[in-house]
Design a protein with these regions (language model features):
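Carbohydrate-active catalytic/glycan-binding domains of CAZyme proteins
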Residues: 1-441, 445-484
Length: 484
């Protein structure tokens, strides 16, 4: 059967999965002719991180808009450390070894690493065992062992598998975590570090340590003079190799950013190189242009193009995170430029300004006071948010005077009008900007149900962004927009 032509392929957006799906911490891997994403699984309206079992999504490498859900691939109930069967599972990673796919993960409030396996990349996976020392002691349980967290696995070209792990924070945050564990009545003594992450080799059985854990990237207490200052390791270890360079990808102490370091070796001599992605677009913009918090992901090469996968935050908390992806530019020396937050993400180019789009693909979202860290302390009465209704239909809520909603990028060709579908508590106006030019105004009347509002615009043929700026005392919900 012939492959799809460009005209047959749908467009890809951010987030790249359906609006009702919440799979953060995405580790992308290409197996044969498909890219698979393995991540945590948040619950809409959940009260904490990772409340759902693991699912897997994949897409053909030639059509990154065509994602398939393979359903629940692992529940963790078979894990002998999951005594109640109700423990949550944090960020996983997967590696293939001799035709078997191994899923590495950690349970909540755990200091160990568990492993499940399958003969297919999409699972289902069955419990296999726990990573352990040569004497059989589970890693994390021996006296002096560091806490294990966010395992990343990497198979080198010679077949050797490396395991990366670690959570490294400030003393203040560590104290808060320990108090939270005590408050929950858990009798767990976790050795949390401030000195970065660890690397170790695995034996052929994928469970036994071939080498003891050694430090890799520095944390806040040992970064002086290393070049990592201000971007020390926090969590989310991931390793990749492209051409002759190894890339250690991680989330820094700043939380919102995915950083990277480079080396000629997978287990030593890494030099800090920069930021790959910020879910607040910090670094591309001087101030955040989207509500930001923790980030986790990695790089994948697909059909000769590099992409960084991460996640964004929605619904006024850090517990409903959605996967996003952006193109990366590799420089001649192997370094990458930071990726800008966009709405087009995995698309082959800018989106076509000639059809309907859902509002939730916004990559710019902020109140008149700007954007801030997404957590329970933020003023939900002031700030807009992406959320969903009882039918799992996504929309932007709490749009008020000064709210800015933006999309990047569109290919404008002969566009003469723009429409939005909204509800509004009062009459108001939306200014429409393309680039820095105001191209039209939407006059929105009070409407209790979704109503389409259209205005004529004067737009030159170009590739550019789209921004709506609300003026007036109305509070709105925003479902979708369209061109012509």
């Amino acid at each position: 059967m012939p492959g799809k032509t460009d005209l047959m392929i749908k467009q890809a957006f951010n987030p790249y999965l359906p609006s009702w799906e919440y799979v953060p911490d995405g580790e992308p891997h290409v197996f044969k002719d498909r890219v698979y994403v393995y991540g945590s699984h948040d619950r809409f309206n959940g009260s904490t991180y990772c409340m759902e079992p693991y699912v897997c999504w994949s897409a053909p490498v030639k059509d990154l808009s065509d994602w398939t859900c393979h359903g629940i691939i692992y529940t963790g109930k078979e894990d002998s450390l999951n005594e109640t069967g109700k423990r949550l599972m944090f960020a996983p990673d997967v590696v293939e070894k001799e035709g078997i796919y191994y899923l590495f993960y950690g349970l909540d409030t755990s200091d160990t690493i568990s492993v499940a396996k399958s003969d297919k990349p999409e699972g289902p996976f069955t419990f296999y065992g726990h990573v352990h020392h040569k004497d059989g002691t589970i890693l994390g349980k021996k006296k002096g062992d560091r806490q294990q967290f966010d395992p990343g696995v990497f198979k080198d070209e010679d077949g050797q598998v490396y395991l990366y792990s670690g959570f490294s924070s400030t003393p203040e945050v560590i104290e808060r975590i320990k108090k939270k564990i005590q408050k929950q009545g858990l009798n767990i003594d976790i050795n949390i570090s401030t000195t970065g992450n660890l690397v170790m080799k695995l034996e052929e059985d994928m469970l036994t340590l071939k080498s003891e854990p050694v430090p890799l990237l520095p944390g806040v207490s040992n970064s002086k003079g290393t070049g990592f200052e201000g971007h020390e390791f926090f969590e989310a270890s991931s390793m990749r190799k492209f051409k002759d360079n190894y890339y250690a990808i991680y989330s820094s102490v700043n939380g919102h950013e995915l950083c990277y370091a480079m080396s000629k070796y997978p287990d030593r001599d890494f030099e800090y190189k920069g930021v790959l992605h910020s879910n607040g677009n910090i670094g591309i913009e001087e101030k955040p242009s989207y509500y930001y918090a923790n980030n986790h992901g990695s790089i994948v090469e697909i059909e000769g193009t590099y992409y960084i996968f991460g996640h964004r935050h929605t619904h006024y908390t850090q517990y409903q995170r959605q996967g996003v992806a952006e193109k990366l530019k590799m420089n001649p020396d192997g370094t990458f430029d930071q990726a800008e937050m966009t709405s087009c993400g995995l698309n082959k180019g800018p989106l076509k300004a000639l059809e309907d789009y859902p509002s939730y693909i916004a990559c710019v979202l902020m109140s008149k006071e700007g954007a801030c860290k997404e957590d329970v302390s933020m003023d939900s009465g002031l700030h807009p948010a992406i959320t969903q209704d009882e039918n799992k239909e996504a929309y932007i809520t709490n749009i008020q005077d000064g709210t800015v909603i933006g999309y990047k990028y569109f290919d404008y060709q002969d566009v003469s009008q723009i429409s939005v579908v909204v509800t509004s508590s009062l009459d108001c106006q939306w200014d429409i900007y393309i680039g820095n030019k105001k191209v039209g105004v939407l006059d929105i009347k009070k409407c209790d149900s979704y109503t389409k509002v259209t205005t004529k615009v004067c737009v030159e043929n170009q590739v550019n962004d789209l921004r709506f700026v609300c003026r007036g005392k109305s509070v709105l919900k925003f479902k979708s927009f369209s061109f012509n």
